[in-house]
């Protein structure tokens, strides 16, 4: 059941051709999704929107100078500055092209720390201490029987992120897309199913 998002958008930063703001909203009561909202500067009317789930490197993934220089050498990257943080650069570029873009955090990454990275991505054991007949936690038999998992919660977060974008006054909800690479590509496939 979809509940109110109670979204908060704050902390605007202006850059050449776009703005960026931090955002958080509730995908389920008490559980927050975090990310960065990019908008084209001085755009008018309803705009297309793109949800950008990052991969396993996280939205704050940075490449070493050697990697960036190698990518420039082979033509995979053009600019040293944008090559350092490719996920943020992709979102900024899409905004400069006229799209509203949400680069949201997977569970355990960047600002999304209600469930730790270790629990969400490195923990794979049953947790009998998290289980009784009336309540349970992730990785318990009760949760598994109800198909409650990190992947399920992350997919729901993606669905709610699309709801968030669709509800923005400057977004045309009929022109929305999802694109991501690596783990973000997996999320793209799941959201498209």
PLM feature spans:
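N-terminal cap/lid segment of alpha/beta-hydrolase-fold proteins
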Residues: 2-49
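Short alpha-helical segments and helix-capping/turn motifs at coil-helix boundaries
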Residues: 20-22, 32-37, 78-81, 85-90, ...
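Short helix/loop capping segments that flank catalytic or ligand/cofactor-binding pockets
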Residues: 33-34, 61, 112, 188
């Amino acid at each position: 059941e979809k509940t109110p998002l109670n979204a908060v958008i704050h902390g605007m930063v202006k850059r050449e051709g776009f703005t960026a703001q931090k955002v958080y909203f509730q995908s389920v009561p008490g559980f927050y999704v975090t990310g960065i909202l990019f908008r084209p500067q001085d755009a008018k009317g309803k705009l297309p929107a793109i949800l950008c789930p990052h991969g396993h490197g996280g939205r704050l993934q940075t490449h070493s100078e050697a990697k960036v220089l190698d990518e420039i050498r082979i033509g995979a990257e053009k600019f040293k500055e944008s090559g350092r943080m490719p996920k943020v650069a992709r979102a900024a570029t899409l905004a400069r092209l006229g799209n509203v873009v949400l680069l949201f955090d997977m569970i355990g990454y960047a600002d999304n720390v209600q469930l730790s990275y270790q629990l969400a991505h490195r923990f794979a054991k049953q947790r009998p201490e998290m289980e009784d007949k009336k309540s349970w936690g992730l990785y318990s038999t009760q949760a598994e029987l109800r198909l409650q998992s990190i992947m399920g919660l992350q997919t729901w977060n993606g669905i709610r992120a699309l709801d968030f974008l669709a509800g923005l006054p400057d977004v045309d909800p009929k022109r929305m897309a999802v694109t991501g690479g690596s783990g973000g590509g997996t999320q793209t496939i799941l959201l498209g199913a």
